[in-house]
Amino acid sequence: MIKSNIQDPPFSISRTNLFDFESEKTTNICNGNSDISYSKIHDNLIYVNPSFTESYSRFEKIKMCTFSGEIIKELPISKSPLPKFRHLPSGRYQRKYYKKIIYSPNGKYICCTDYENQGYINIEIIDNKTGYLMRKFECSDDESICFSPNDDLITFTHCNKCFTWDIKSNEKLDEITIMKHNIISIHYISNEKFIIITKKHSLKYIFNSQHYVAIRNICNKESVTIANFGNVIKFFYCPTRNYLVVLKESGINIINPETGKTKKKFVCDTINQYLFDILNKDTNNYCLATISNNNRIISKRIKKLIN
């Protein structure tokens, strides 16, 4: 991932850049190590800048800004004060830093994750209007966090279990236990159904991992596997076109989650970097992407293939 010019905190954070499809140029509107999320409803960006200078502060702020970087609003997040130390805190006293921030689809909530030294991650659901902390959960992988299209539900994983909660009522609606598989990512296709992608635990597949794509129905508690793939680099879900895109070393597979039908597109072998939210661009042809050190996003080629 791209590293910041400033001294990084002692954990891995990637820089998120703003990418323009037409000019194929990237810009970074915030300082250093920040994750960014875009709201189509509000047409703005949100981010949090983690910094050692705030390690003794009681407040951290979520910043909302335009695409030019102009700050629209700041939401202070109240944190309990730390005891005074002669040296920089470490271990259980080390300051938590937000590493991922997610807008809910309708912009009602903001989800923030922070680091835990015990190997788990805290999920904090914050009301966008008031800045109040609505709910707090614990998960094992921030890539699995996903809101339902109507903002009412949140789904996440903890170890080998997948949970779905009603944010307003704080009621657990669904729980899945998946043995012999790692849960890779979750993508809602409706308010009652979501895609769950898993990777199989097996010595046989160490160098050729098999990924499985299943549809989970929250209402009847049933899961149906619709596809499986090997040599996968990344999965993406496009809510506007309602299909799942599988980025592989040999090409792109496009899956219709409703029918399970798959079509394959061959692309250049140099597409080997991880891309984030490449399909979820706004009307001005911007998208959020993370770029690797050695490669650039072949934006126009991908755009022509998936349209």
UniProtKB/Swiss-Prot annotation:
This is Uncharacterized protein R882. InterPro entries: Quino_amine_DH_bsu, WD40/YVTN_repeat-like_dom_sf. It comes from the Viruses.
